A protein has these predicted regions:
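Sequence/structural signature of beta-propeller domains
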Residues: 1-214
Length: 214
């Protein structure tokens, strides 16, 4: 996400087993890393491999979507984590996932436009087994982060679009990883999928418009 000063904030999904930390990276316009911010102890103590899947900026606050439940989350709840770039304070809210069927349910993106934060929520299934590939939104006014280590408020979500009809439109199978969403200055929404390489799939990647996001 843009930092408002010509650079970018990036979310790094780590893997402790491979000695790759979760965290935030602040880079300049050339992509040079100028600052690295690791997780605070309250988050690090409960992390799992499925970490930050997107970052969005609202004023001085960065919001990150955590893909799946961490060890301190109630079942069916994932964190939207907040980091204040001016004060260095961390916080979070809980986001309620859709009921889980086969596989797992999680978040794959967060982006901000107007008065809302938009997230992609999906299962990890393909083809006929895929049930949830959706865009939801949360009111920015409801994103009031609580202190880590205690009870977190649960935000209300509103469904914006079911993406499965879009994913079926090409006549192929429904792909798994819907992982990117952006809204341009005219209000048009764009979605992109991640093929994770081509070793065990067709390698198909989709990039498409969902039209005006009202």
């Amino acid at each position: 996400t843009l930092d408002g000063k010509g650079g970018f904030w990036l979310a790094s999904e780590g893997n402790t087993a491979k000695m790759v930390p979760h965290g935030l990276l602040h880079v300049n316009a050339k992509g040079e890393i100028k600052e690295q911010i690791g997780l605070p102890p309250e988050l690090a103590a409960n992390e799992v491999r499925f970490g930050f899947e997107g970052v969005a900026k609202v004023g001085d606050m960065l919001w990150m979507a955590v893909q799946r439940e961490w060890r301190d989350d109630p079942k069916g709840m994932v964190k939207l984590v907040a980091y204040n770039t001016e004060t260095g304070e961390w916080g979070a809210v809980h986001y309620p996932l859709e009921p889980k069927g086969a596989g797992w349910m999680g978040l794959s993106e967060i982006t901000v436009a107007g008065d809302h934060a938009y997230v992609i929520e999906r299962d990890n299934q393909i083809g006929a087994a895929a049930v949830v590939k959706k865009i939801f939104r949360v009111k920015l006014a409801d994103l009031a982060p609580a202190k880590l280590g205690g009870d977190l408020p649960v935000v209300a979500k509103e469904e914006v679009r079911d993406l499965i009809p879009d994913l079926k439109a090409t006549g192929g199978y429904v792909v798994d990883k819907v992982e990117g969403f952006a809204i341009d200055a005219a209000g048009e929404g764009f979605v992109v999928t991640d093929n994770d390489g081509v070793d065990d799939s067709s390698g198909e990647t989709l990039f498409f418009s969902i039209g005006k996001v009202e």
